[in-house]
Amino acid sequence: MLFFSFFKTLVDQEVVVELKNDIEIKGTLQSVDQFLNLKLDNISCTDEKKYPHLGSVRNIFIRGSTVRYVYLNKNMVDTNLLQDATRREVMTERK
């Protein structure tokens, strides 16, 4: 649940999602669920010449299992808080 909690803190932030089929989609994260499915608004494809059919799409739902990577702005992540949360989760799993 750590990643779910982490991504919920990124709602209304701009992210770039790289899919397993090499498509990169930039947009505003609107929601995330426990399966790490993502809903993005105001999207744009980073390579619109290669994927022209995405040019007219503004909102998209991305299944979590198709995501390869999510690019974040460095200042969007509090690394100390993330490290502490990771340690707490490991400690609760050991009990």
UniProtKB/Swiss-Prot annotation:
SUPFAM superfamilies found in the cross-reference section: Sm-like ribonucleoproteins (SSF50182)
GO cellular component: a single term: P-body
Gene3D superfamilies: 2.30.30.100
One Gene Ontology molecular-function label: RNA binding
Biological process, per Gene Ontology: deadenylation-dependent decapping of nuclear-transcribed mRNA; mRNA splicing, via spliceosome; rRNA processing; tRNA processing
UniProt-listed PROSITE patterns: SM
SMART domains per record: Sm
Domain Sm: 2-76
Subcellular location: Nucleus, Nucleolus; Cytoplasm
Chief place where the protein resides: nucleus
Result of altering residue 37 to A: Strongly reduces affinity for poly-U RNA ends
Swiss-Prot/TrEMBL keywords: Cytoplasm, mRNA processing, mRNA splicing, Nucleus, Ribonucleoprotein, RNA-binding, rRNA processing, Spliceosome, tRNA processing
Extra information: Present with 2210 molecules/cell in log phase SD medium.
Family in the record: Belongs to the snRNP Sm proteins family.
Assembly and interaction partners: Component of the heptameric LSM1-LSM7 complex that forms a seven-membered ring structure with a donut shape. The LSm subunits are arranged in the order LSM1, LSM2, LSM3, LSM6, LSM5, LSM7 and LSM4. Except for LSM1, where a C-terminal helix crosses the ring structure to form additional interactions with LSM3 and LSM6, each subunit interacts only with its two neighboring subunits. The LSM1-LSM7 complex interacts with PAT1; within the complex PAT1 has direct interactions with LSM2 and LSM3. The LSM1-LSM7 complex interacts with XRN1.
The protein's role, per its UniProt record: Component of LSm protein complexes, which are involved in RNA processing and may function in a chaperone-like manner. Component of the cytoplasmic LSM1-LSM7 complex which is involved in mRNA degradation by activating the decapping step. Together with PAT1, the LSM1-LSM7 complex binds to osmotic stress-activated mRNAs to attenuate the osmotic stress response, probably by limiting ribosome access to the mRNA and consequently translation. Component of the nuclear LSM2-LSM8 complex, which is involved in spliceosome assembly.
Protein name: LSM complex subunit LSM2
Annotated organism of origin: Saccharomyces cerevisiae (strain ATCC 204508 / S288c) (Baker's yeast)
